[in-house]
A protein has these predicted regions:
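N-terminal binding-site loop/beta-alpha segment at the start of enzyme catalytic domains
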Residues: 1-77, 115
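Active-site beta-loop-alpha junctions enriched in small/polar residues
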Residues: 21-23, 53-55, 82-86, 122-125
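Conserved catalytic core of Hanks-type protein kinase domains
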Residues: 42, 82, 111
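Generic structural signal for helix capping and beta-alpha/helix-loop junctions
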Residues: 59, 86-89, 126-129
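Generic beta-strand or strand-like secondary-structure segments
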Residues: 64-68, 82, 100-107
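Structural motif corresponding to the early beta-alpha repeats
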Residues: 72-98
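Glycine/proline-rich, positively charged
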Residues: 92-137
């Protein structure tokens, strides 16, 4: 596996990343055991960059991923999630306020069973006021 540093962060990530949207049933339903096994296999094979969002499966992807991550040493992966776009009960919402972004990070850490998240991305900024994203989010 080839690894590259993200800018000057010191974070070295695999060229192939694990996009966890499918753990939330975004494309089709997946058994939780299969989803967790997929995470284990990816990390075991050297894929150390995992990307997810609370929006994927309306929190389900983070919840399922968290069950897998609980069993993997924290130094084996770089974790990325997002703020700004959310969903619940089939309803999509966007909130780029600093307050909601901060709340979202803590909520994600709880669902993911981690003490910290390495990277936070702003999800779907085309729906946001860019001044708010730059100055507040």
């Amino acid at each position: 596996m080839i690894y590259n540093e993200i800018g000057k962060t010191g974070l070295r990530v695999s060229n192939l990343s694990f996009g966890a949207s499918s753990l939330g049933g975004v494309f089709h339903q997946i058994r939780e055991t299969e989803a967790i096994d997929a995470v284990f296999t990816a990390v075991e094979k050297g894929m150390n960059f995992i990307d997810v969002s609370p929006y994927y499966g309306h929190y389900k992807a983070e919840t399922v991923l968290g069950k897998a991550l609980k069993e993997i040493p924290r130094n084996k992966y770089i974790l990325s999630t997002k703020v700004g776009r959310y969903g619940k009960d089939g309803v999509n919402t966007w909130d780029y306020s600093g307050k909601r972004a901060t709340e979202s990070v803590y909520e994600s850490m709880e669902r993911l069973n981690v003490d910290y998240i390495d990277l936070i991305n702003v999800h779907d900024i085309e729906f946001a006021d860019l001044n708010q994203v730059v100055n507040e989010t």
